[in-house]
Structure formats: structure tokens, C-alpha cells
Amino acid sequence: MSKAKGTGFSSIDTEDENLRERYVNQPKANASDIQDEQLDCFEQLEEKHRTKKNEEYTALKILRDVIGPLLLTITSFYLRFQHIDQNNYVVWDEAHFGKFGSYYIKHEYYHDVHPPLGKMLIALSEWMAGFDGQFDFSSNNAYPENVNFKLMRQFNATFGALCTPVAFFTAKWMGFNYFTVYLIATMVTLEHSYIVLSKFILLDSMLLFFSMTTFACMIKLYTLRKQQMTKKWSLWMLLTGLSIGCVCSVKWVGLFITVVVGLYTCIELFLLYCDKELPRIKYYKHWLIRIINLIVIPFLIYLYCFKIHFVLLYKSGTGDSTTNTLFQINLEGTQIEAGPRDVAFGSELTIRSHGLSPNLLHSHIQVYPEGSGQRQITGYGFADSNNVWKFEFSRSSGLELDQNGTLNGKIIPITDGVEVRLSHKNTGSNLHSHDVPSHVSRGNYEVSGYGSQSVGDEKDDWIVEIVKQMDSPNPVYSNENSTILHPVSTFFRLRHKVLGCYLASTGLTYPAWGFKQAEIVCKDSWSRRDKSTWWNVEDHWNHNLETAEDYVPPKSNFWTDFILTNFAMASSNNALVPDEDKYDSLSSDAWEWPTLHKGLRMCSWAGYITRYYLMGSPFNTWISTVSLIIFPFIILFILYRWRRQTLYLSDDQIWQITIQGIFPFISWMTHYLPFAMMGRVTYVHHYVPALYFAMLVFGFVLDFTLTRVHWMVKYPIYLSLFGGCIYIYNLFAPICQGMHGDKAEYLPLQWLSTWDIAP
């Protein structure tokens, strides 16, 4: 009994010796071995649990970061491609940008207020569509059957659709709550103004896309701020520069987001400067890398776009008048006529300024309303009979041309230092200046048309000063007399004999009484390099001299063409001012955009046509505008608590507030306030980039407000916001997907009396 009890097996038959011997002789288990076996078992269970959790997390991450944004992107493509060819007429600014694209197909030079990248991309879409350039994109005209306008529009819509994933990852990198990230991406996807602008051959979707990518790249650099100088950081720095170059090459509005990136860069460099552990040589390296990537590369992209622009447009076209003579005469089919190579007394000619405003010297019968009251002298770019002048002998010389345009049968060339008088062919008045202030610029003298062939004084006299001669590639004309005035290749100045000032173009324009033409003055100029006082003869006629048909003009300088083209763009842009005497139903004021006070009819409102109304989503616009009002108070609240030392903010928290709230707010201001302050005419679509940044501000306000709210309150709020965004899109979908038939059917969408959707 005692033995059986000792073994602890009382229930087993002890008469079986073999069995008893087997158990009696078996060694006892070690306690540490049992513990190790138990630990191994627990570790295996934990590993299985950890693997399962990792698999679940990976699946969730793929669903959240890949499948989710992919579905939103597909939705974005669908909404922008949907019914894209339903309106087969030229809609709104397709009349401009479709036509500009066709000029690249035909290689005809044109002028526009915007840089060329966006229009070259439109030309690419036209080339892909097999367009031959013959359709002129006249407003409201139907597209011919042989013009694949659907593909052109789809190409443009692609930029708009890709804004959705850019918005998603930007919001994610900014550190927003994932519900907020998805809400912002959904708002961008369902924004009515973004959808409708993407459906047509316009620049706005490209501008929005590159503005968003520039901001996204900046945010990505923020996430990599502790990994500076790594390959990944360097790649995103390069992408930022490429994006800046693209957005500025589509529209100058891209400069606004460039300012934001510049501000962020300055903050980074300042913080690096304050880092006493950073060697100075590394600090200067940071400067160098940013200068190369954020200044040099964008500028080279901008420059290269113009290089391609000039190479493609090698034929004479509608934009010739905005360029200098050398550029024009090198165009195929130029309108500048071949003429004699020596300019002489009796020659009739046109004279073009070599300044930043390369206009032709012009006069007409109208007089100055103030000042001398004599005939106006202006600069005018287009071919016109009022641009023609004639070289006469000066008043003080007492000489006159005979009936054959010679001096007693002799042809007297115009040489350096000779005194001349310029008479206007149509009015007969003389180019004149006197001690009367100019009308637009300050500190200059008025230039007027005065007298006639027989009436005048010494203030009609000017002295020719030759400043530069350019040689022809043709050896026959490569050694022309450098003291004689030659058309096209000679640059000269006209110094007033009495006042000592120089005939100049200021780059400014006269008011309506001067037909918005360029101001011409007589200015004191102490430098021969002052290009505003440089002129050249463009067209030249003299029946006493032989025409040089085989003359080959010098090539124009790329840098000169680049600078003059950009200045012409700026001048044209500044000229887009509202006409106070004319009501423009399409234009709107900046205050009307965030309030959604007014929209824009994009096409004819006839009942038989598919109609589109450019207006922001009421949900997106109004909720983001409210956020813009709330945001400054949130910042003041944070500063107040920080100042009272009731709130501690770490460096990372300060950065988070800056990136999520302050930079989107600054971006909104830089994209909105310039339009509110500028004098040019403005339209609803000018708010497109600013609206995106207003949505990001809304994301910050939402995240800040709901940070400590219980999930039972937070989730219903998010659900209602998603529901509201989707519901408002569906309600107002006709304004961006097309309205058909009876206009009265859309009266329920007429929420405000200022909206003209239904009438």
C-alpha cells in the first residue's frame, strides 16, 4: 500500500511487474524543462496572434491606403468622363484654348496672356485626336464630325480626375484623421466646379492639378524633415521643383503656390540656421540644394517651355504684332515686305520700338484732350496705314525734297548724327515734342503730331543716333555701311534737337481717349543701353532705290524674344480691366466666390442645348468658408492658452498646427486676395485653387473640434458630413453633368435669387 501510494498510481494493478517496473524506473521530470515547454507554447500562441494581427493590419492598410483612394479615383474619372461629349458645341473658353492648341498644329505664331505649357498640352491632345487644325473653334459653333473633341476633352479631364488621389495623400501626409482624409478626398471628387471645368478644353484642371501636386510635394518634404539629404528627401525636393515649374508654365497663378513653398523653405532654413550643431558648410549646402531645385529647375522648365513654343510656331500668325521686327521677319510667310537696304531722305517707312513694348510708331487725327491739344502720337502693334512715316529734311536745314523724293536728283542716305524731320503720311503732321508733361507717365515730355509740310518749327527736328548694327548671314550684305541707317538690322535713337530728350515707349497705355494704345514720350535718357529709346525701321519703301529681294535678316535673340514675350503677356493681362460703360454678365467680384453669390453660364442657354453652370458645390463652398472664419479664432485660442501657460506645445505639435492649419490658410489667402485686390476683370473660375485650400482648412477645423469628442458623437458627425457632401452633389449634379430641356425643371436648384440656373 505504502509503495503504491508513494507512486501516486493507486488505481493501477500493482501485480503487473512489467508495468510497475516501467513506471518505477522512469526518471522524474525536471521543473525547469516543464517551464520551458510552457513558455515555448505561449510564445507560439503569441506569434500566431501577432501574425494574425499583422495580417489584419496589412489588409486594413491596403484597404485604407490603396483600395479606398483607388475607388475614389475611379469615381472621379467616371464623373468627369460622364457625358463628356453630350454638348457638341464649342463651350466657353474652348473658343480660346482650343484655337491656341490648333495654332501649334498649324505652326502659326499667336499671342496669349498665359505661358505656353498648358496650351501645348492641349495641342498634344489635338494631335492625339488626329486634328488637322482647320476647325477654328468659334464660340458656340458645333464641332464637325471629323474633329474628335471627345478625346481632347478626356485628355483634359484626366488632370481633373487625378486631383482626387493627390488630395487624398496630401491630407494623409498632413496627419489628418483618416475620416477627415477621406472626407477631403470625397469633397474634391464631388466638387461641381472641378467636375465641370474638367469636362472641357480649358487650363483650369491643369492649373489645379499642378497647384495641388506642388503643395503635396511640400507636405511630403515636411514629413521627411528629419531625413534631410537622404535620397528620398532629395527626390521629393526635385519633384517639388518640377511641379513648381509646371504650374508656373500653365498660368502665372502658379506663382501664388510658389510663394507658399518659398515661405516654408525660409522657415526650414531659419531653423537650420538656429541649429548650432549644424556645420556651416552643411548649412550652405542646404541653401545650394534648395536654390537648384526650387529656383533653377522651375526657371529652366519655364524657359524650356518657351523654347519649344518658339520652335513649334515658326510661321507668321495672329501674334506677330506683339513681337519685335527680327522675330517677325524670321517667321515663315512674314508680312514684312522686302525693301531697299539703305534708308534715305524721302523714304517711307514704319518704325518699331525695341523696348519692352515693341509697338509701331503711330498717329491719327484724334487729339490729346489735355496738354497741347495736338494730334496724338501712340504705339500700335498691328499693321495700319497710320503707322507710315516719311523722312524729311530738318526745318533748320532749309532743304526740301523735290517731286521725285530726291535733293536735286541726289539720293541722300540717313546717316549717324544727321538731323531729320518725320512727317506722318496720312495726317501730314510732324513728329513734335515740347515742354508739356506726358499724359500717363511722370517726368517725361509729350510727343505730338503738329503742323504740316509748310507749318512747323525747330521742335519738329530730331537727330539720328545709330547704336547698333546687326550683320546678315548672307555674305553679300554682311559688310553694310555701319554709318547708314538700314531697315531691320539697324537700331537707332531719335534725340530731340531742342529738348535733348529721346523718343521712347514707356510700356504704359493711354486711357480710352487714346484707344488703350501705347504711350509714346520724349524722355531724358543718360544711357545708350536704354532699350525703351531704341527703334528700328521695319517696312521700307523708296521707289528711287532697288529692293533687296535676296536679303537674309539676322536671327533674333532667344533671350530678347523670351523677355519681350513675357512683357507682352503682362501688358495684355493688365489690359483686361472691366469696362465701366458695359455690363458683363459673366464676370464677378471676389467676394461672390466664397459666399457662392453668383455662378456663370458656360454656354448658350437655349432649351435644345445641353447647358452647364459653373458654380462651386454649396456644401463644399459654404462649409469651407465658415471654416475660414473659425480658423483665426482657433489659432487665437491656442495662442491664448499657450500664453497663459495652460497649454504646452512640443515642437512636433507646433509643426502639426502649422502644416495642417496655418499653411492651408496662407495658401488660401495667396490664391484669393490677389484677385480681390487686382483691377483686372475676374470670373468664378479664379477661385478654383483657393477653394481647395479652403477645404484643407476645413479639415483642420474639423479635426481640432472633434479631437476629444466621444466616438458616439464623432462618428455620426462624420457620417452626416459624408452624407451631406454626397446628397448635395446628387442634387446639383445637373449643373456639371448637363441640363436638358425645360429650364423650369431646375427651379428647385435656384436657392439664391442671384443664381441664374433656371430662368
From Swiss-Prot:
Disruption phenotype: Affects GAS1 and GGP1 O-mannosylation. GO terms for biological process: protein O-linked glycosylation; protein O-linked mannosylation. Signal peptide: none annotated. Pathway: Protein modification; protein glycosylation. Residues 340-394, 409-467, 482-540 form the MIR domain. InterPro entries: GlyclTrfase_39-like, Glyco_trans_39/83, MIR_dom_sf, MIR_motif, PMT_4TMC. One of its GO terms (molecular function) is dolichyl-phosphate-mannose-protein mannosyltransferase activity. The chain crosses the membrane at residues 59-79, 165-185, 195-215, 252-272, 294-314, 619-639, 657-677, 687-707, 716-736. The modification N-acetylserine is found at residue 2. SUPFAM superfamilies: MIR domain. Glycans are attached at residues 156, 404, 481. Belongs to the glycosyltransferase 39 family. Protein O-mannosyltransferase involved in O-glycosylation which is essential for cell wall rigidity. Transfers mannose from Dol-P-mannose to Ser or Thr residues on proteins. This is Dolichyl-phosphate-mannose--protein mannosyltransferase 6. The gene is PMT6.
